[in-house]
């Protein structure tokens, strides 16, 4: 019979039931580097969240500050527009990292939400040459049901590409967990990992 202690869903960092896979080793090798984008893709229940949690732990062990955004937990009211979700993103960064610069100090509707969030990250986090930040986006699939999805992932892609133009952006690592079906929106950036194949 099944062991009642076996866990379902995300497996805790200290769980004796977590089975380490090849993808864990790949993550452990990527995360300490600067300016990496890691895409963890696969259907539900293959260990994406567990792998993301371990990636976050590796980032912390390497002196990076981390922000974990689980899109399942975000209130529906923040998904009314691209501005809504990106402003929420900015407020979470400010709260979790206790930044002295606040979103209201930088946000400019005349520039639009993507540029405002980008400027906020630069001024609040990346201006500090000592700060390295890993942002984890779990269950990013939720974005795909909204009309602003292209704008959201264009913003992520712009941050990825910005590293070639502005060295500050090499202090930002991105880790994105998503299912295989909508991957076209974020294909061709970063290192793609599939826990189901590990």
Q: What are these regions, as identified by a protein language model?
A:
Residues 60-78, 135:
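Conserved catalytic segments around the Walker B and adjacent sensor/switch elements
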Residues 66, 79-102:
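Conserved NTP-binding/hydrolysis module of P-loop NTPases
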Residues 115-127, 155, 176:
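Conserved helicase/translocase P-loop NTPase motor core
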Residues 50-55, 84-92, 151-159, 196:
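Alpha-helical scaffold elements adjacent to nucleotide-binding pockets in ATP/GTP-utilizing enzyme cores
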Residues 1-45, 50-59, 119-127:
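Walker A/P-loop-proximal flanking segment of P-loop NTPase domains
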Residues 142-198:
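The catalytic "switch" region of P-loop NTPases
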Residues 77-83, 100-123:
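Short glycine-rich substrate-engagement loop in P-loop NTPases that contacts/grips substrate
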Residues 106, 124-152, 159:
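Conserved P-loop NTPase "ATPase switch" module shared by AAA+ and STAND
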């Amino acid at each position: 019979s099944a062991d009642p202690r076996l866990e379902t869903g995300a497996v805790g960092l200290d769980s004796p039931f977590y089975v380490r896979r090849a993808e864990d080793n790949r993550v452990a090798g990527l995360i300490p580097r600067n300016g990496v984008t890691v895409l963890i893709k696969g259907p539900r229940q293959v260990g994406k969240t567990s792998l993301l949690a371990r990636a976050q732990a590796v980032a912390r062990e390497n002196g990076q500050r981390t922000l974990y955004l689980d899109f399942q937990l975000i209130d529906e009211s923040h998904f009314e527009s691209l501005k809504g979700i990106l402003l929420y993103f900015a407020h979470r960064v400010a709260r979790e990292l206790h930044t002295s610069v606040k979103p209201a100090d930088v946000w400019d509707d005349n520039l639009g939400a993507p540029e405002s969030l980008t400027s906020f990250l630069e001024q609040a986090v990346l201006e500090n040459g000592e700060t390295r930040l890993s942002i984890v986006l779990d269950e990013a699939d939720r974005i795909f049901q909204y009309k602003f999805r292209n704008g959201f992932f264009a913003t992520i892609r712009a941050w990825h590409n910005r590293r070639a133009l502005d060295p500050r952006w090499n202090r930002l690592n991105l880790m994105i967990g998503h299912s295989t079906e909508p991957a076209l929106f974020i294909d061709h950036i970063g290192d793609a990992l599939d826990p189901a194949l590990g």
